[in-house]
């Protein structure tokens, strides 16, 4: 028997799990910036992983869109002066302290 409500619930759970992965990747970006700033650097690169072992698979393009939105927010609030994206998956950050 077809149970559309169950399918919808599973899809929502999948999207929620994927968003958690996006948040983990964004936290890694922030950690990378903080570590490099502590080392006295004013720039860093971050390679967005196309997959993470032991994590749910996620749509890579959706992840990049999520990260772009979050990065735009920190650009407004923090001292990030330059953000560049290099295809297929590399972010370049430069900041002014």
Residue spans of the language-model regions?
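An N-terminal amphipathic alpha-helical segment
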Residues: 1-57
């Amino acid at each position: 028997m077809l149970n559309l409500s169950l399918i919808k619930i599973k899809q929502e759970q999948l999207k929620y799990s994927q968003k958690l992965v996006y948040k983990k990747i964004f936290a890694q970006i922030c950690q990378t910036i903080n570590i490099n700033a502590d080392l006295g650097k004013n720039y860093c690169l971050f390679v967005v992983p196309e997959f993470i072992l032991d994590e749910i698979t996620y749509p890579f393009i959706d992840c990049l869109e999520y990260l772009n939105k979050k990065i735009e927010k920190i650009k407004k609030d923090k001292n990030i002066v330059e953000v560049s994206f290099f295809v297929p998956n590399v972010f370049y950050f430069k900041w002014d302290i």
